[in-house]
Amino acid sequence: MKIPSQPRVLNELRKLVSRNELDVRALARVINQDPGLTALLFKVVGSSAYRKHQPFATVEEILHAVGVEQTFNLVQAVALSSAGSIEKNRMAYEVFWARSHAIGQLAMLIADERIAVCNIFPDQAYLAGIFHDCGVPLLMQRFPTYCAEMKLGVHGTWIDLAEEDKKFNADHCVVGYLVARHWCLPEFICDAIRYHHAISELGVHEARSMVAIVQLAIDIHS
């Protein structure tokens, strides 16, 4: 099973951010190297969660208004959906990412409304929303019958964890956790991905609020 590699732009951004080189012009130049990521970033910050800052005309404006680390989180999220590709089950793959983006947007709005209570920021919620089921495409690639067995093309249905384990000896939550770790996501977001179907196993944990937000977003989307 091959974990998708991170785009070069993302690696360059991470190096700059980790060195605390927060020159907005330099960061914007790196992001602008990838027109696809840039377009997706503008689409995300067009959400009502960032209504206080809109409209944005440049990536520099986004970095100034939203924040460097927050923008980096958003870039990570949009990069994932364009990092891999699949030849078979193309329709199911596209439906999967449409669902993930919708849940990410809902999670972002929920976090924006509940930030004083949950202490989860919109960019973090969007990142978790996009990544929460990211193990699914890898299992689609690994197992030719995964889509059919998990009924991914059936409206209103989603993956049954017990059936997934029984038929494929796999857990998309664990696979997603490994992807998140490989992409160097914050630890509490990695844990939220791992336990987003088992919130009770987290106990008193900072990922618990994130799981609650993602699950509410899933319920609203359903």
Outline where the language-model segments fall.
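GAF sensory/regulatory domain recognition
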Residues: 152-157
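Conserved alpha-helical "signature site"
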Residues: 1-145, 159-222
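A Zn2+-metalloprotease active-site environment signal
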Residues: 146-151
